A protein has these predicted regions:
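Short beta-strand/loop motif that positions the catalytic acidic residue
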Residues: 226-228
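Catalytic active-site module of serine/aspartate enzymes centered on a nucleophile-bearing elbow/loop
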Residues: 254-319
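Alpha/beta-hydrolase-fold enzymes
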Residues: 105, 111, 115-203
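N-terminal cap/lid segment of alpha/beta-hydrolase-fold proteins
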Residues: 1-22
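Short beta-to-alpha linker loops that shape the active-site pocket of alpha/beta-hydrolase fold enzymes
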Residues: 65-69, 143, 261
Length: 319
């Protein structure tokens, strides 16, 4: 059973949450957060998906849509523009604060996909008081910088994701991700512009100049699990995912490559690591086990040291 919930956010936001599973007494409370050019459907494909799987394992699961996505308001293309600052400073904090009030005695896990993991990290860096309620993070195909890959990969990122999408956005007033085959949901021009700037350069806010990388240095980051598909060459390359884990500093982290023949029955890309039915046998159990282990108060942290870019390039994958 899926229960729809509305959560109020600043600047006129009305966010859709979908709850699966009964309110738990001991199981993990899990928020699922989509990324750019996507929405909550990535966690809820027909008759399967990560949201349903985790609910069946005893988790209380909340699937979110940020403004401009799904049925949340304001909608994309309406009179009110969708800006990155709304997502980071209004929507994500509103969701976390609502969950904290709904489950005051339980700690929260957040599972993010793609750019959703970077948005979540930025929101937490801006409002570090929210970190106290978070028990752990699962990052699926999440990276900030886009440096890895060969010539074709770099061409696809710069020309299709970058230049062509930006030109189309200027004409249409939105990034037509669906018609361009870039995603399952059209995207805000401002959100896309900020993502492009972040993947090519410094992690700095384009509106007020807030330096996320500098502010991050004083924070203790939550335990995190990072997964990347071996066929994800453009949006979540393993080397870029690992680089993002290092960027977040010294913390309890596992970085895992989902690779055919090494624990997985098939190759996985950026989206089908969530939507393919076989994921329920390949790596969804890994996610559920990680959540259960990190919820235990006796869990011992394994620190993931900060390394240079050269160290990241030559590092062995943790599998």
């Amino acid at each position: 059973v899926i229960e729809p919930i509305r959560v109020a956010s600043d600047n006129g936001g009305q966010l859709q949450l979908q709850r699966l599973g009964a309110a738990p007494t001991s199981g993990p409370v899990v928020l699922l957060l989509h990324g750019a050019m996507s929405d909550s459907r990535v966690f809820l494909p027909a008759e399967h998906g990560l949201a349903r799987y985790l609910a069946e394992q005893g988790c209380c699961v909340y699937v979110a849509d940020l403004r401009g996505h799904g049925d949340s308001q304001p909608a994309l293309g309406g009179p009110q523009p969708i800006r990155m600052s709304d997502l980071l400073q209004a929507d994500i904090p509103a969701l976390l604060e609502w969950l904290r009030s709904e489950h005051p005695d339980q700690r929260l896990f957040v599972v993010s996909h793609g750019w959703g993991g970077v948005w979540l990290a930025a929101a937490l860096i801006r409002k570090p008081q929210l970190l106290a309620s978070i028990c752990g993070l699962v990052q699926l195909g999440v990276r900030r910088r886009a440096l890895a890959g060969g010539r074709f990969t770099r061409f696809a990122r710069r020309c299709i994701w970058g230049a062509l999408a930006s030109i189309a956005g200027r004409f249409k007033g939105r990034i037509p991700a669906c018609s361009m085959g870039l995603g399952s949901h059209d995207e805000s021009v401002d959100v896309h512009t900020v993502c492009l700037a972040w993947e090519r350069g410094e992690w700095r806010d384009l509106e007020d100049g807030f330096d996320y990388a500098s502010a991050l240095k004083s924070l203790a980051w939550p335990p995190s699990l990072y997964l990347a598909g071996d066929r994800d060459r453009v949006l979540g390359h393993m080397q870029d995912v690992r680089r993002f884990a290092h960027e977040l500093g010294r913390h309890d982290a596992q970085v895992i490559l989902l690779e055919k023949g090494r624990g997985c029955s098939r190759h996985y890309g950026h989206t089908d690591l969530l939507t393919h039915p076989q994921a329920e046998q390949d790596h969804f159990p890994l996610i559920a086990d990680w959540l259960a282990q990190r919820q235990q108060p006796t869990h011992t942290q394994e620190l993931f040291p900060r390394c240079s870019a050269a160290d990241v390039e030559g590092a062995a994958y943790i599998t």
